[in-house]
Amino acid sequence: MEGVTYEMMLNVEQLERFGIHPTRLYATGGGATSDVWLKIKADILNRPITALSAKEVGAAGTCMLAGVAIGLYRDLRQAKEVFVKERKTYTPDAEQVAAYRPYYKAYRELYDAVRPIVEVINEKL
């Protein structure tokens, strides 16, 4: 769980390099049903994580877009009020955030060290 979340943190850092600073994240799908994993995500990512109630968010998103396209909803904000229901929000715990920090640093260093090897493998595929 932590490894996948460290990878998510790499993505968040990439967004931040481009000037996008997410202050809150949403979780969907199977992973959004695990209270333990969502708490880990909140602590590692140091941001609130809100789990959505919908199980099939792809289908819900399609319905939202279709509803706006045919005039059923004024815009996506209005469609969101109908389709998007928040189940629970997990907030970061400062002590846990600090505890995960050295592990993430080690993960990042390992990622950077292995990256050239992965590039060689990708060239051969």
Describe these PLM feature segments.
Residues 1-125:
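Glycine/Thr-rich phosphate-binding loops that ligate phosphate moieties of nucleotide
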